[in-house]
Amino acid sequence: MKKDRTVDQERYDQLLSLGYCVFPQVLSEELLDAIRCQTEALCTTLPAEENDRHRSQGTMLSAMSFPLLAELIAWRPALAILEGMGFDHATFTDGYIISKFPQSPRLFWHYDWFAWSDPSAYAPKPQQIFFMYYLSDT
């Protein structure tokens, strides 16, 4: 973390202690509406057997194929949040569009960290952070 500027220490501490922070209304309504339209269209074009196969986890589409999501990935207000907590060099690794059916079981987050042999894997500072945007009420 950079020491030469003001850091949102409260949010950073919350991230370390709880594992998450909530930042409401990061996206503009215009971008949010565009993403909602595109993701809704993508999810409605999936074959029924695809939806049946992933009934409990929901649909998971890679965000890598959708140009509109590049704007979301590079969204300046979101990157400013990271910078405000001292994460100055954010990079993008991967992204998913997840669509779950109402009343389906809740999901758990799981990621197999690829760098357990690196000493930084055991430091308090997170090695990876992700943004999760809810496009509809849950």
Language-model segments: which ranges?
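Non-heme Fe(II)-dependent double-stranded beta-helix
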Residues: 1-17, 23-124
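Short, conserved beta-strand element in jelly-roll/cupin
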Residues: 117-138
